Design a protein with these regions (language model features):
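Conserved N-terminal beta1-alpha1 strand-loop-helix module at the mouth
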Residues: 1-88, 142-143, 147-150
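Hydrophobic faces of well-ordered beta-strands that scaffold small-molecule active sites
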Residues: 8-16, 39-43, 62-68, 94-96, ...
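Glycine-rich, proline-tolerant flexible connector loops at the mouths of alpha/beta enzymes
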Residues: 30, 34-50, 69, 94-112, ...
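Alpha-helix-loop-beta-strand connector modules within alpha/beta enzyme cores
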Residues: 45, 49-71, 106-133, 166-193, ...
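Catalytic cores of alpha/beta
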Residues: 52-53, 71-85, 136-147, 170-177, ...
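Glycine-rich phosphate-binding active-site loops on the catalytic face of alpha/beta enzymes
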Residues: 65-69, 88-103, 150-165, 189-225
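Conserved anion-binding
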Residues: 78, 83-84, 93-154
Length: 225
């Protein structure tokens, strides 16, 4: 099967989340994401306003900010504060990390209550919840999937890219098999090539998170899968 690179890009959140990311890096990433019509540019909380400003200059591009990133174990109040600030700065999408430790400890009610609060705060915006699958058992992945679906989030996202592993075909297939109505899948972490990204889209993902697919040397062509 063939898939155009431009289609892959249209489903990709172009990320600039490395610890050394600067304001200039974010502005450049925003311009590139807009130029090639990515789904969004995904940036640290402190640079959301800069990305929004660059997006106004560059043209149509959505700005996504991350919260509770990358470990997920800040308090619910801290996540709410972080998200509220990003929405005020102009973010249209939020990628927030699940409290992985609470999930693994069986504190289901805590996780459920937090997710409901975050969904209420982001009503009218795109909310993606990062499950960080590399740390979860199969049963925990399915529990995360259910809780994220029940809260009304838009996406379950596989990984931050900062854990012990990234997106896998096995995890995406598992999520796709048990996916609740209305929930979509974002694969992220370790996706380095267009071929990898295309495979995840074929498996049923609606979004890809990647930092290395776009550059000024991009050339449109079809991908052989």
């Amino acid at each position: 099967m063939d898939m155009k690179k431009s289609f892959v890009i249209s489903r990709t959140d172009h990320t600039v989340l490395k610890q050394t990311a600067s304001r200039a890096d974010v502005e450049q990433a925003t311009l590139i994401a807009a130029r090639f019509k990515a789904a969004s540019v995904c940036v640290p909380p402190c640079y959301v306003e800069d990305a929004v400003r660059a997006a106004i200059i560059a043209g149509q591009i959505r700005v996504c900010g991350v919260a509770g990133f990358p470990n997920g174990y800040v308090s619910t109040d801290a996540k709410i504060f972080e998200i509220a600030g990003m929405l005020e700065d102009g973010a249209e999408e939020i990628d927030v990390v699940l409290n992985i430790g609470a999930l693994k400890a069986g504190e289901t009610e805590y996780v459920k209550t937090e997710l409901e609060a975050l969904r209420a705060l982001t009503e009218g915006y795109i909310l993606k919840v990062i499950a960080e699958t590399c740390f979860l058992t199969r049963e925990e992945k399915l529990l995360a999937l259910k809780l994220i679906g029940d809260c009304g989030a838009d996406f379950i996202k596989t990984s931050t890219g900062f854990g012990g592993g990234g997106a896998t075909e096995e995890d995406v297939s598992l999520f796709k098999r048990y996916l609740p109505d209305g929930l979509k899948i974002k694969a992220s972490g370790g996706i380095k090539t267009f071929e990898q990204a295309a495979k995840f889209l074929l498996l049923g993902c609606d979004r890809i998170g990647a930092s290395g697919l776009l550059g000024n040397d991009f050339i449109e062509e079809e991908i052989k899968i």
